[in-house]
Amino acid sequence: MAVNRNKPWLKSYPEGTPEFITLDPRKTIIKLLDEAESSYPENEAFVNFGVSISYRDVSIKSKKFAAYLQNVLGLKKGDRIAMMMPNVLQYPVAIFGALRAGLIVVNVNPLYTPRELEHQLRDSGSKAILIFENSAHVLSAVIENTDIEHVIITKIGDFLGPVKGSLMNFVLKYLKRMVPRYSLPGKINFMSTLGRPVTDLDETPSSINDLAF
């Protein structure tokens, strides 16, 4: 595949991946994921820090996360959930999970200042937020001025395995000191949200006309 100098990211595509793909405009994002899982369950879906998750992993984890959002947090179709994190493996799982639950995803720049974060949360009316621990101190400074009812914290090593994940968490927090102190009473650990049975999910049929983001 020849690489267009105006599109340098193409050189990172796996061999055989076309520059352009045609998607059926009648299919939702969740439908596309379900089809990928059905056709290529063990294929790599996402890779980060040398760790990959398959389409099956993404599908199962996203359903469990969706079940938690519905059954434990009580979020309903049309509610907003903010997501403030970089490109880590938890992000696609959370995105698909929120959409399965019928929620609207509000993406938030993880580099936002407290003032910028407060504005976006208030403007969107988000009821919940999944936030990277490195940014949690920003939220703690303004959460009282927002409608946020539920805070879910994710760490860099959550999906990197027990050894690599624990090491990454330790280095980031204690050696590089990239996790400032914060106070968010009642915060939820992201990994604990993946314990619900998939059967608990009430996956309301979605439409291409539903607001996703």
Residues of each region from the PLM?
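Conserved ATP-dependent adenylate/AMP-binding module captured primarily in the ANL superfamily
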Residues: 112-145, 160
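Structural motif
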Residues: 82, 128-130, 152
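ANL superfamily adenylate-forming
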Residues: 142-209
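Flexible, non-catalytic linker and terminal segments flanking ANL/adenylate-forming cores
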Residues: 1-26
